[in-house]
C-alpha cells in the first residue's frame, strides 16, 4: 500500500489529531515527520477520554499501530519521557513507539537561547512557543546539531556538546547577559534521560520502506499547518520546519512516489495562535463566539487562539502547494446557531481584487477580505452521521467550501468525539 499524508491546511490547530485517530484503525504505521513539542493534538476517544499529545503521534492511542517519530522531528528528551509516562499511567501501551536515529535532540541551550531571543526582540518577536524548536533546527542546518543516535556514543556526544557550547555560551553571556551552561552537566543530563528511550532508537526509514513493500499502510502526520511552513507560510511568522506535504517525504525517508493521498485538515472557520497576518480575524462578538464555542485555546501553549471566518483564499493555496486530494472539515458544529455564515472568497489589496494569496507579507497585511454570506442553521448537528442528516443550509455551506477549496470535503467533523464524523468518501480506498 502507498503512504498517506495528513496536513493542516490553515495555521495549525485544525483538528489533525481527530483525523489521525479516525484513520488509525485502518493503518499499520503512523509517522510524525516534522516539528517538535511546539504543537499539540487533541484526541477524544469514544469513552470520552481526552488526550493531549505534543510529540508522540496520535496513532499511539490505537492498539496494534506502530508509531514513529521521524528524522524530521526535533525531540526534547524530557518532554518525550514525560509524555510516555503520562500515557502509560492511563493504561496506554507505548511499546510500539520507535524513534528515528537521525531525529535531532533538543538541548537545554536551545530552550535558553529561544527564550532570551524572544525577550530581546520585544515587540518585534515572532511569537514562538519558547521551547527551543527554532534554535534546534538552526543547529541542524548549520551541521552542529545533536542527533538521537549520538546518545549511543558518549565520547562523541561530549565532543559535540562541548563544541556547540563554545559558541553558544559566548552568545548567552556576552550578548544576553545570562549564565554559561556547563557542557558536562548538559551531557550527563541527556545521557540519564536516554536510558528511558535508547531501546526505541531505530533505522526508521528502513522500517517504513520495508512496511510499504509488505503492503502495509503508512500515515504521515504533520504538525502545525500550511501557512506556518517555513517556505510556503506567512514568513517570518512561521515555524522552523516544513509541515506541507513535501516535508513528509524528507522528514520520514519515504520517497515521494510512494505517496498517493494527501488529506488536508480544514477548520470550518479560521484560527491562528501568535503573531502574524490574519485577514479574516474578528474582533467583535462573532470572534468571541467562535473562541468560546470552539474552545479555542492552544493545546501546547495555553494561549487563546485568534478567530476569524473561513478563508477560501488560503484553502485554495493549501490545495495547490500540498497537492491535496481530499479534505477533512472539522468543527462544523461550532457554526450552528449563527444567522449568517460569511466566507472570505477573495481579498482587496490597494483597491484591486484578487482571489489568490498575495505574494508579499506587506500585501497580506493590507488585504481586506471580500465576503460571500450564506444563511446559517440553528439545528444541533452533533448527532449527524450521514451528509443527508445535516440541515440543507449546512450542506450548502460544506458544498460551497468544497467548490472554493478545490478538493472534496471527504470527511466532516460534527463534534470532538471519534464517532462524531461524517464520512462522505472512503479516503483509504483511494490509496
From Swiss-Prot:
InterPro entries: Adenylosuccin_syn_GTP-bd, Adenylosuccin_syn_Lys_AS, Adenylosuccinate_synth_dom1, Adenylosuccinate_synth_dom2, Adenylosuccinate_synth_dom3, Adenylosuccinate_synthetase, P-loop_NTPase
Cofactor(s) listed in the protein's UniProt record: Mg(2+)
Binding site residues for substrate: 299-305
Cofactor note: Binds 1 Mg(2+) ion per subunit.
Source superkingdom: Bacteria
One GO process term, biological-process aspect: IMP metabolic process
Protein name per the record: Adenylosuccinate synthetase
Biological source species: Mycobacteroides abscessus (strain ATCC 19977 / DSM 44196 / CCUG 20993 / CIP 104536 / JCM 13569 / NCTC 13031 / TMC 1543 / L948) (Mycobacterium abscessus)
Amino acid at each position: 500500500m502507498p503512504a498517506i499524508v495528513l496536513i493542516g491546511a490553515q495555521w495549525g490547530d485544525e483538528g489533525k489529531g481527530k483525523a489521525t485517530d479516525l484513520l488509525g484503525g485502518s493503518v499499520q504505521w503512523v509517522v510524525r515527520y516534522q516539528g517538535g513539542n511546539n504543537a499539540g493534538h487533541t484526541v477524544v476517544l469514544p469513552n470520552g477520554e481526552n488526550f493531549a499529545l505534543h510529540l508522540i503521534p496520535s496513532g499511539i492511542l490505537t492498539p496494534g499501530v506502530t508509531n514513529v517519530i521521524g528524522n524530521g522531528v526535533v525531540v526534547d528528551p524530557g518532554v518525550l519521557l514525560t509524555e510516555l509516562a503520562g500515557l502509560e499511567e492511563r493504561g496506554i501501551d507505548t511499546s510500539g513507539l520507535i524513534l528515528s536515529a537521525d531525529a535531532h535532540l533538543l538541548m537545554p541551550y536551545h530552550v535558553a537561547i529561544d527564550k532570551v531571543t524572544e525577550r530581546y526582540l520585544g515587540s518585534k518577536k515572532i511569537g514562538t512557543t519558547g521551547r527551543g524548536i527554532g534554535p534546534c533546527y538552526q543547529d541542524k542546518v548549520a551541521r552542529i546539531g545533536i542527533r538521537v543516535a549520538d546518545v549511543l556514543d558518549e565520547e562523541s556526544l561530549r565532543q559535540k556538546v562541548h563544541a556547540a557550547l563554545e559558541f553558544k555560551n559566548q552568545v548567552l553571556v556576552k550578548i544576553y547577559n545570562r549564565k554559561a551552561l556547563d557542557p558536562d552537566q548538559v551531557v550527563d543530563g541527556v545521557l540519564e534521560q536516554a536510558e528511558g528511550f535508547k531501546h526505541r532508537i531505530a533505522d526508521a526509514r528502513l522500517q517504513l520502506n520495508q512496511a510499504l513493500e509488505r503492503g502495509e499502510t503508512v500515515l504521515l502526520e504533520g504538525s502545525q499547518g500550511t501557512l506556518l511552513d517555513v517556505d510556503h507560510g506567512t514568513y517570518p511568522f512561521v515555524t522552523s520546519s516544513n509541515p506541507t506535504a513535501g516535508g513528509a517525504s524528507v522528514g520520514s525517508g519515504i520517497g515521494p512516489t510512494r505517496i498517493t493521498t494527501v488529506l488536508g485538515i480544514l477548520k470550518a472557520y479560521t484560527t491562528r495562535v501568535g503573531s502574524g497576518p490574519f485577514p479574516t480575524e474578528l474582533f467583535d462578538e462573532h470572534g468571541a463566539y467562535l473562541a468560546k464555542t470552539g474552545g479555542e485555546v492552544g493545546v501546547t501553549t495555553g494561549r487563546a487562539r485568534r478567530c476569524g471566518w473561513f478563508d477560501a483564499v488560503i484553502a485554495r493555496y493549501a490545495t495547490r502547494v500540498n497537492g491535496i486530494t481530499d479534505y477533512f472539515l472539522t468543527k462544523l458544529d461550532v457554526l450552528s446557531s449563527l444567522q449568517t455564515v460569511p466566507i472570505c472568497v477573495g481579498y482587496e489589496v490597494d483597491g484591486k481584487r484578487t482571489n489568490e494569496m498575495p505574494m508579499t507579507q506587506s500585501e497580506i497585511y493590507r488585504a481586506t477580505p471580500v465576503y460571500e454570506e450564506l444563511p446559517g442553521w440553528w439545528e444541533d448537528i452533533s448527532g449527524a452521521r450521514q451528509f443527508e442528516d445535516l440541515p440543507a443550509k449546512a450542506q450548502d455551506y460544506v458544498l460551497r467550501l468544497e467548490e472554493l477549496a478545490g478538493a472534496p470535503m471527504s470527511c466532516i467533523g460534527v463534534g470532538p468525539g471519534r464517532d462524531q464524523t461524517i464520512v462522505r468518501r472512503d479516503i483509504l480506498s483511494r490509496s
